[in-house]
Design a protein with these regions (language model features):
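Short hydrophobic/aromatic beta-strand immediately N-terminal to the Walker A/P-loop
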Residues: 6-8
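NTP-dependent small-molecule kinase module
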Residues: 149-200
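Glycine-rich phosphate-binding loop used to anchor ATP phosphates in small-molecule kinases
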Residues: 56-106, 142
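The conserved Walker
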Residues: 12-13
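Conserved glycine(s) of the Walker
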Residues: 16
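Conserved substrate/cofactor phosphate-moiety recognition/catalytic segment
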Residues: 21-74
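A glycine- and Lys/Arg-enriched "phosphate-lid" helix/loop adjacent to the NTP-binding pocket
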Residues: 100-146
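Phosphate-binding P-loop
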Residues: 1-3, 71-72
Length: 200
């Protein structure tokens, strides 16, 4: 019997985490926790007060914690979406300590401009707004952390998601810190973003 799995679905804003996870996540009953969706749902339900945004964040965080606790108790697989920017290893380390295998699915975009464009399209369709400076910060931080922490995951798949209305292209697989398949060197924009991975 295999260990339960944590699947981290990572990438910058607009990379397609929510749109494509159903195509890319291994077949299971696991529905990835979408923090942004929970936040937006709570935000819209709250009355307009000064601390409305913070309250919505607190409620979304509570939702995440509750679902994680339930997964731990039942030893079920768990998945969540993240920009992989702030404390990216906090939850993976917690799951590892609980005996979970760590899987990372990372979606790449070839520019910050494309990320901003997709955020604006999402806003036009009822999604949440993210300021340009925050999109840029998350873009670089996500790649920096991928380059830094990739060896701590048991299994990683990296995808290129810049093409419009197409399922992302598989670029690399990493198993226990060892690159077993890679076309990363074909993508010039990745050269300075994940140099450690490309050199493997």
């Amino acid at each position: 019997m295999h260990n339960p799995r944590l699947l981290v679905i990572a990438g910058c804003n607009g990379s397609g985490k929510s749109s494509f996870s159903k195509f890319l996540v291994p077949s299971s009953n696991t529905i990835p926790f979408d923090y942004d969706s929970h936040f937006l749902s709570h935000y819209r339900a709250l009355i307009d007060i000064d601390i409305k945004e913070q309250m919505a964040h607190n409620l979304a965080s509570t939702d995440l914690n509750d679902e994680i606790e339930e997964a731990w108790k039942s030893r079920k697989d768990f998945a969540f979406e993240t920009n992989f920017d702030t404390e990216p290893m906090y939850w993976p380390n917690q799951f590892k300590a609980k005996g979970y295998d760590l899987f990372l699915l990372f979606l790449c975009l070839d520019s910050i401009e494309l990320a901003n464009k997709r955020v604006l399209i999402r806003v036009e369709n009822g999604g949440h707004f993210v300021p340009k400076y925050e999109v840029e910060r998350r873009y670089y931080a996500g790649f920096e952390n991928l380059n830094k922490y990739y060896a701590q995951f048991d299994f990683i798949d990296i995808f290129e998601g810049s093409a419009h209305a197409r399922i992302p292209e598989h670029m690399a697989t990493v198993e226990n810190g060892k690159v077993v398949f890679s076309t990363l060197d074909r993508y010039l924009y990745l050269k300075n973003l994940i140099p450690e991975l490309i050199s493997r």
